[in-house]
């Protein structure tokens, strides 16, 4: 008996998204000859219909940047929104989700920010925090969520075992990595992160023998900043 070949995940998901668009939104896909892509101006059609208006207003209200390929069927930003935004006003469901991921007692979900209609939201998206923890913000003004600064794909807050916790979510779909860091980016990255990368000032063990530049390879670069 021979093993069946494992289908390429990216190719498989392209086919699935193309079939989905053809069935649910006939005639809308096909941007640049790809059946799994919508025209950029139709990015909201890539969202769950129940959250399209909500997402548009939330992004506008908070001046959040849409990813360049938000109209792509394999957009991880859109995938994250489709899964988590419908739960933003359902702390009971989010509590069970957090418990299943982290274990422990059922947490009490805490408000992250207000939604477009002024209601409490228990999930935030493209989150940059309230202070310039990573030395990334512009000299004047606030950073733009989702662009040019580290932005968590989603954030949740909860209380569990008497402690308040913040959970940052890094959402992936079909991303791949392999290209080396660009040398021209190294000086600025060192300025930002060198003093805050290693314990006791950062998340990386200081006795592991790592150099700051070794953290600039993806996907480790994203993970250590969050």
Predicted features, each with a name:
Residues 86-93, 157-165:
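Short, solvent-exposed loop/edge-beta patches enriched in aromatic
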Residues 174-226:
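Acidic, metal/cofactor-coordinating or nucleic-acid-engaging core segments within structured domains
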Residues 1-132, 136-144:
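Nuclease-adjacent, charged terminal/linker segments that flank catalytic cores
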Residues 130-132, 161, 172-176:
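Short, solvent-exposed loop/turn segments at secondary-structure junctions
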């Amino acid at each position: 008996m021979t093993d069946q070949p494992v289908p390429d995940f990216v190719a498989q998901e392209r086919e699935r998204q193309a079939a989905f668009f053809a069935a649910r939104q006939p005639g809308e896909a096909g941007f640049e000859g790809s059946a799994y892509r919508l025209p950029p101006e139709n990015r909201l059609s890539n969202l769950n219909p129940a959250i399209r208006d909500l997402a548009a207003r939330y992004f506008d209200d908070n001046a959040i940047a849409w990813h360049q390929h938000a109209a792509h069927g394999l957009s991880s930003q859109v995938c994250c929104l489709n899964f988590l935004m419908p739960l933003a006003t359902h702390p009971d469901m989010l509590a069970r989700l957090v418990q299943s991921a982290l274990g422990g007692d059922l947490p009490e979900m805490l408000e992250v920010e207000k939604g477009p209609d002024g209601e409490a939201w228990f999930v935030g998206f493209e989150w940059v925090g309230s202070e310039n923890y990573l030395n990334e913000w512009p000299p004047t003004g606030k950073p733009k969520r989702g662009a040019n600064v580290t932005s968590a794909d989603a954030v949740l807050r909860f209380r569990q075992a008497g402690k308040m916790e913040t959970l940052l979510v890094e959402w992936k779909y079909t991303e791949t990595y392999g290209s080396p860091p660009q040398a021209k980016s190294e000086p600025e990255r060192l300025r930002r992160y060198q003093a805050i990368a290693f314990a006791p000032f950062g998340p990386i063990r200081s006795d592991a023998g790592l150099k700051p530049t070794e953290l600039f390879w993806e996907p480790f670069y994203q993970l250590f900043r969050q």
